[in-house]
Amino acid sequence: MSTIAESARIHPMAVVEDGATIGEGVKIGPFCHVGPHVVLHANVELLSHAIVTGRTVIGKGTRIFPMAVVGGDPQSVHHGGEETTLTVGANCTIREGVTMNTGTADFGGQTIVGDNNLFLANSHVAHDCRVGNHVIMSNNVMLAGHVVIEDRVILGGGSAVHQFTRVGRQAFVGGLSAVSYDVIPYGMLNGNPGLLSGLNVVGMTRAGVDRAVIHRVRRAYKSIFEGPGSVRENAAAIREEYADCEQAVHILDFIAADSDRALSSPTRGQKG
């Protein structure tokens, strides 16, 4: 039996299957479909024709627009019908035609989306992705399986991110870019194949990062990608010099971390 809060408003032409949990203040419009294992927290709004299915939890205040399908089975040949999940955080906006899939059993079974994210029309979050907070995915952005998107990343329209790739905090990916390799935090990537084109200085400035700090991060960037060794060797060599710079340390930690993908760089042949 479903658990439906008294203050929830469900249109008579919507379908809420037995077993769903509907929180206070939830609004479900006409022709929506809510599956039996779905949890909608307080003040979630489903506009007409939105579908939430699978073992999916939607955080408070999130709005889902027409024709979005949230919680569908993973688009993976390895999926055998296992009970996997999707969790979407609070205050997200999921626009028309967006698709988000649950995880796959072989990789923990979870797709996780954070808070305050904006997913524009027809963007796609595949199985086992991890999306942080305050992320903007523009129209037609495609995340393949197992992608990690850190906080405050902006992905331009039509960009595509290869499976298992990481995009670091506050990076900016230009429209129609092909992201085949990890993108460092605060980096800017453009093109197909995607190449780094410097730092997201505008984004850092808007976030209140001091100009002197931005200058230091630029120096670190130059040392990493223009130094005598490999990218990882260069990053390790400057760690002590930049130990007091939060942004630089985050870049260095990102480079040092284990990853299934190489690092994007300013030149096609250099991959860290």
UniProtKB/Swiss-Prot annotation:
Listed GO MF terms: acyl-[acyl-carrier-protein]-UDP-N-acetylglucosamine O-acyltransferase activity
GO biological process: lipid A biosynthetic process
CDD domains: LbH_UDP-GlcNAc_AT (cd03351)
Pathway assigned to this chain's UniProt record: Glycolipid biosynthesis; lipid IV(A) biosynthesis; lipid IV(A) from (3R)-3-hydroxytetradecanoyl-[acyl-carrier-protein] and UDP-N-acetyl-alpha-D-glucosamine: step 1/6
Keywords attached to this entry: Acyltransferase, Cytoplasm, Lipid A biosynthesis, Lipid biosynthesis, Lipid metabolism, Repeat, Transferase
GO cellular component, one term: cytoplasm
EC number(s) on file: 2.3.1.129
Keyword presence, Transcription regulation: no
Listed transmembrane segments: none
Pfam families, A to Z: Acetyltransf_11, Hexapep
SUPFAM superfamilies recorded: Trimeric LpxA-like enzymes
Catalytic activity, as annotated: a (3R)-hydroxyacyl-[ACP] + UDP-N-acetyl-alpha-D-glucosamine = a UDP-3-O-[(3R)-3-hydroxyacyl]-N-acetyl-alpha-D-glucosamine + holo-[ACP]
Alphabetized NCBIfam families for the sequence: lipid_A_lpxA, PRK05289.1
Function as written in the Swiss-Prot or TrEMBL entry: Involved in the biosynthesis of lipid A, a phosphorylated glycolipid that anchors the lipopolysaccharide to the outer membrane of the cell.
Name the UniProt record assigns to this protein: Acyl-[acyl-carrier-protein]--UDP-N-acetylglucosamine O-acyltransferase
Organism (species): Rhizobium johnstonii (strain DSM 114642 / LMG 32736 / 3841) (Rhizobium leguminosarum bv. viciae)
